[in-house]
């Protein structure tokens, strides 16, 4: 695999070169400005191209080494793009309001995440919130929704991220300051009104246009996926050539799967699939419904079946990361 390709023409078509009005600028961005046209600063794309490449390389290297990338974009036009890109690349995101202390007070945030998971178990588990009055269930449901909106994108992060990718450092200034305080590198899109100081991987570009944001997120997601592939290679894992998992042979619909063979039930004691990143009790149940009960089955998935299972459980792009995890967890079980 390789880093995603892009051209200056793509950047132009997405409007990456358009900055803010010339009176709304940060003089520290002067080295990245090509000139002024119709009272609008024009960003020098000859600098954006290599800067973006460096940022993508940092993302890929971080993921290849087993690190976590946190996408941060809470402005309206970035929210959906950021969440989609993070999900597809098995990474994490904050696209609602950045809560002060999300990084610097991780212990408290972890407690809130634990509360979110507890509420989900209470409201969607076998008891379905029984034992509570209708009003109490409504209150708990509202609390769950509020926590999920704020923390849903980092609920499975398990610790501090190793790299932040930020859209608009002015709006996300608290996130940037927290990362800098903890020594976490930041890759960021910097418009002409931003401050590049302290940004490890600055990428001069339009941080307002929807098409530009979509392009950035797509490229960063693909860079993260490249890192996942490189990480597998470094571990000597060939996803399509894993040793066959120890599962019972059952007749399946011809052509339904590439090589995966579902089980009608666990062979002995089922493995705790919730140990895989992003697997909640609900996702584990969906995997069981598909005939997946053991880490060995996940470790043996080829790319086609991994993609299909991801689509079935509603986490496209996440299963590739599970394959490497399952390989290690399967060895521990043995």
Curated annotation (Swiss-Prot):
A GO BP entry: translation
Family: Belongs to the universal ribosomal protein uS2 family.
PROSITE patterns reported for this sequence: RIBOSOMAL_S2_1 (PS00962), RIBOSOMAL_S2_2 (PS00963)
Key words, A-Z: Ribonucleoprotein, Ribosomal protein
Pfam families, A to Z: Ribosomal_S2
Record has Phosphoprotein as a keyword: no
NCBIfam families on file: PRK12311.1 (NF008966), rpsB_bact (TIGR01011)
InterPro entries assigned to the protein according to its UniProt record, in alphabetical order: Ribosomal_uS2 (IPR001865), Ribosomal_uS2_bac/mit/plastid (IPR005706), Ribosomal_uS2_CS (IPR018130), Ribosomal_uS2_flav_dom_sf (IPR023591)
GO cellular component: cytosolic small ribosomal subunit
A GO MF label: structural constituent of ribosome
Signal peptide bounds: none
Highest rank taxon of the organism: Bacteria
HAMAP family tied to this protein: Ribosomal_uS2_B
Gene from which the chain derives: rpsB
Organism annotation: Xanthobacter autotrophicus (strain ATCC BAA-1158 / Py2)
Protein name, entry field: Small ribosomal subunit protein uS2
């Amino acid at each position: 695999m390789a880093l995603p390709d892009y051209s200056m023409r793509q950047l132009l078509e997405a409007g990456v070169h358009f900055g803010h009005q010339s009176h709304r600028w940060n003089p520290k961005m002067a080295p990245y400005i090509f000139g002024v046209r119709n009272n609008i600063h024009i960003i020098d794309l000859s600098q954006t191209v290599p800067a973006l490449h460096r940022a993508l390389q940092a993302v890929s290297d971080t993921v290849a080494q087993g690190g976590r990338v946190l996408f941060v974009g809470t402005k309206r036009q970035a929210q959906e793009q950021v969440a989609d890109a993070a999900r597809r690349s098995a990474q994490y995101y904050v696209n609602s309001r950045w809560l002060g202390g999300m990084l610097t007070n991780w212990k408290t945030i972890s407690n809130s995440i634990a509360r979110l998971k507890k509420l989900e178990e209470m409201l969607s588990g076998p008891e379905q919130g029984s034992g509570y009055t209708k009003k109490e269930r409504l209150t708990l449901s509202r609390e769950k929704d509020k926590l999920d909106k704020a923390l849903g994108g980092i609920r499975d992060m398990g610790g501090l991220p190793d790299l932040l990718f930020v859209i608009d450092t002015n709006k996300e200034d608290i996130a940037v300051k927290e990362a800098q305080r903890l020594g976490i590198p930041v890759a960021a899109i910097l418009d002409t009104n931003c401050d590049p100081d302290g940004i490890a991987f600055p990428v001069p570009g339009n941080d307002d246009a929807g098409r530009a944001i979509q392009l950035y997120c797509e490229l960063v997601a693909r860079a993260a996926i490249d890192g996942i592939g490189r990480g597998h290679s470094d571990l000597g894992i060939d996803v399509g050539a894993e040793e066959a998992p120890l599962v019972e042979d059952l007749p399946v619909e011809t052509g339904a799967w590439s090589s995966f063979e579902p089980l009608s039930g666990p062979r002995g004691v089922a493995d705790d699939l919730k140990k895989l990143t992003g697997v909640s009790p609900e996702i584990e149940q969906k995997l069981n419904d598909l005939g997946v009960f053991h880490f060995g089955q996940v470790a043996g998935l080829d790319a086609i079946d991994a993609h299909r299972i991801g689509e079935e459980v509603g986490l496209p792009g996440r299963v590739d990361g599970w394959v490497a995890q399952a390989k290690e967890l399967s060895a521990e079980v043995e």
